[in-house]
């Protein structure tokens, strides 16, 4: 194919993955299959525990269940295709599948970003306005915030996809990654379109910065509120309600920042893929463990859920 041809002339891209050493493919396949199964099972357990336990039918756990759903979809966007490619010893992905994967990945990446900000607002109201919590964070507001997060995420992904569809690629269409990632596609293009590149690179950063600023403001107000509590026990109880969310926020944004910095600084062909593992695979896998270990209500609900399943299995057996 000649340099400068439109992307519509390409039938497929090639995902280079982590390594070209075939001896490591089985190890990578087994590792990522295990992490994927743990991610799906862990987040499904969180969702089932919240649905089946009536005392968890609160705004905080409503958003947590949605975050678990997003984590499952977020990981499912990339890992199954990578596992299929390793199993079939193929690195190709069709042009249409690549754009679709990028679009869906952006939707759930932004959804996770916005849900963390919404959960921070929920914690802010709970800690700073406890007497008005049920009035402010009502069912209608929860649905509205969730729908708003979906709409913005889908709109952003749709705009980015339209931009990519107009790009021109030159030379090899090899992506040094294990999935079709927006930044990698923007680096492959030879289109000299400054507005398009600005939108592709700046808008995701701006959306993340807006959400993160909201989280920082919420926790600034929470810390100020906790500081005014006179007893140590009261301070500990107030902080413990935010500990799990704060841990997930720290993990999500630190790994995301690590991916952004590594892709901008390190020039190794497989460095971006390796750095993305923490953000795209490890973080969704750890989220259920963070909430189940640090949150007594979730831990108790999971124990009841598992005990109930054991009893059902005993009676049916």
UniProtKB/Swiss-Prot annotation:
GO biological process, one term: signal transduction
Positions glycosylated per UniProt: 5
InterPro entries: GPCR_Rhodpsn, GPCR_Rhodpsn_7TM, Olfact_rcpt
Subcellular location: Cell membrane
Residue ranges annotated as Extracellular topological domain: 1-26, 81-101, 160-197, 262-273
Disulfide bond positions: 98-190
PROSITE patterns with a match to the protein in the record: G_PROTEIN_RECEP_F1_1, G_PROTEIN_RECEP_F1_2
Family membership noted in the UniProt record: Belongs to the G-protein coupled receptor 1 family.
The protein's name in its UniProt record: Olfactory receptor 1082
Gene source species: Rattus norvegicus
């Amino acid at each position: 194919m000649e340099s400068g041809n439109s992307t519509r002339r390409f039938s497929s891209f090639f995902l280079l993955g982590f390594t070209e050493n075939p001896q490591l493919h089985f190890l990578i396949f087994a590792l990522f299959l295990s992490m994927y199964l743990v991610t799906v099972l862990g987040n499904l357990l969180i969702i089932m525990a919240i649905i089946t336990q009536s005392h968890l039918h609160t705004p905080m756990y409503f958003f947590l269940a949605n975050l678990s759903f997003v984590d499952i979809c977020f990981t499912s966007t990339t890992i199954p295709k990578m596992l299929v490619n390793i199993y079939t010893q193929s690195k190709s992905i069709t042009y249409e599948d690549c754009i679709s994967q990028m679009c869906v990945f952006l939707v759930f990446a932004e959804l996770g970003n916005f849900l963390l900000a919404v959960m921070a607002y929920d914690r802010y109201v709970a800690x700073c306005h406890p007497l008005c919590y049920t009035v402010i964070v009502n069912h209608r507001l929860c649905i509205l915030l969730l729908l708003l997060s979906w709409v913005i995420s889908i709109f952003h992904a749709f705009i980015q996809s339209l931009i990519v569809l107009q790009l021109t690629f030159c030379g090899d269409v090899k992506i040094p990654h294990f999935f079709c990632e927006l930044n990698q596609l923007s680096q492959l293009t030879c289109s000299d379109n400054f507005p398009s590149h600005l939108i592709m690179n700046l808008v995701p950063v701006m959306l993340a910065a807006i959400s993160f600023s909201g989280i920082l403001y919420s926790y600034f107000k929470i810390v100020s509120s906790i500081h005014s509590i006179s007893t140590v026990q009261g301070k500990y109880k107030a902080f413990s309600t935010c500990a799990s969310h704060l841990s997930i926020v720290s993990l999500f944004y630190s790994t995301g920042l690590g991916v952004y910095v590594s892709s901008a600084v390190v020039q190794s062909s497989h460095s971006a893929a390796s750095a993305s593992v923490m953000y795209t695979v490890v973080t969704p896998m750890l989220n259920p463990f963070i909430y189940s270990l640090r949150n007594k209500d979730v831990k108790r609900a999971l124990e009841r859920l598992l005990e109930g399943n054991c009893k059902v299995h005993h009676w049916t057996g």
